[in-house]
Amino acid sequence: MKEKEYRTASAARGGLLFMRDIPGGAFGERVIVKDHRGRRRNGQVIFTSGEVVLVQVFEGTDDLDLERTWVRFLEEPFEIPLSPDVLGRIFDGVGAPRDDRPPMIAPLKRNVNGAPVNPVARAYPQEFIQTGIAAIDGLNSLVRGQKLPIFSGSGLPHNRLAAQIVRQAKLLGEETRFVMVFAAMGVTYSDARFFQEEFENSGVLGKVVMYLNLADDPPIKRLLLPRTALACAEYLAFEQDLHVLVVMTDMTHYAEALREVATAKGDVPSRKGYPGYLYSDLAEIYERAGRIKNRRGSITMVPVVSMPSDDITHPIPDLTGYITEGQIVLSRELHHQGIYPPVNIPPSLSRLMKDGIGKNSTREDHPRVASQLYAAYAKALEVRNLASIIGAEELSPSDRQFLDFAGQFEQRFVKQGEEEDRSIIETLDLAWDLLSLLPQFALTRVTEADLAKYHKWEGDSEREAPKMDSPHEEISEKS
């Protein structure tokens, strides 16, 4: 390999270095920038046009004397060293250690941009992943190989929820090791310390690889971090045959860094100033999750997206929703009521849930119980709105039962302790406890066999379940 070195920097702006008279510079090529003091900085080519090359410098362009700055083109993509020893380590966006331990020394290196996967070679996501969180496991189940984002807002406990998922996630009845890759972008020192202490104190750090980008780090590094983390995840999943859960927070910080760099490049802005290629850039990250035929490992992804002004139509959550397979939406109203995790059930959805639950996965009644809970809670919210207008005393007896169900559902099912790890069996049993609060005619989405086996009838646990004319009839939207 013949390296080329040039001293033709013409301008530096926002972490970008503009080079001229560079024949043959390649997109994605790794470069080394050396300043007049001999200090080296890492960079990557992000644009080429004729003999003009644009280099993003990960450590920033501050204090660069352009006339005395050398740029060496290495004619190779940006790669990171990888080995099974990455577990338990903490790195930054370029793969440098952040844990006061030596750099990784490994003969194996992998391109941070990953290898293209033939869509035909992809396997359909299946198999239930237990997070220990009832609102997710019971109603919005996570499936191995799925992309399921968390839509949050400023001040909501998405960091605590992400840490809890990393601590508690597991595959049921699976002997293959289940490991996590945790990527944090634009977080504060206190948040970074929180994550590190959470994983250390709970004893899971040994099966977690952490990639941290702090709020005061150059935004250029933020753009590389999710790709670096996913390169590690692909190595663990498809070369070490491990099941990998990738949790990334916060993709909004990533998108804002992308907007900042795009503005410095002079790209034409689109919605709210974000570049027109925001969708394809996010897809390039999200679509690296999944399963591959004839490979035992898998990558499951849970990205956290904080919605500016709680606006779910904002470009970042909006485009994320088009790419991923559902969403977990957090509610500010539930948060103010002291409910953790404040999962807003009606707008939350897991599109692949049906492929990971039921007989031989969780329990045979799971799909029907989840449907019944959704229907009952939707009806209960209608009754709650009606009660706010006419008063609870004017409600019919059955509507009062639904009103009581709404409060009990939020306080007992959605709400749980931050250290509470509920099994899927505990979650489903709790669901049946709550359904016993409802009138019998409302239980139309479960079968007679389900009622006979699991339902707890008030007053007489031995009483036979009543016959139902249409066990699958949907509840009318209006009483």
UniProtKB/Swiss-Prot annotation:
Gene3D superfamilies, alphabetized: 3.40.50.12240
Keyword Repressor: no
Origin: domain of life: Bacteria
InterPro entries: ATP-synt_VA_C, ATPase_a/bsu_AS, ATPase_F1/V1/A1_a/bsu_N, ATPase_F1/V1/A1_a/bsu_nucl-bd, P-loop_NTPase, V-ATPase_su_B/beta
Keywords (A to Z) from UniProt: ATP synthesis, Hydrogen ion transport, Ion transport, Transport
Keyword DNA-binding found: no
Transmembrane intervals: none
Gene Ontology terms: biological process: proton motive force-driven plasma membrane ATP synthesis
GO molecular function terms listed in the Swiss-Prot or TrEMBL record: ATP binding; proton-transporting ATP synthase activity, rotational mechanism
Pfam families: ATP-synt_ab, ATP-synt_ab_N, ATP-synt_VA_C
Region (Disordered): 458-479
Family statement: Belongs to the ATPase alpha/beta chains family.
Known role: Produces ATP from ADP in the presence of a proton gradient across the membrane. The V-type beta chain is a regulatory subunit.
HAMAP family membership: ATP_synth_B_arch
Protein name: V-type ATP synthase beta chain
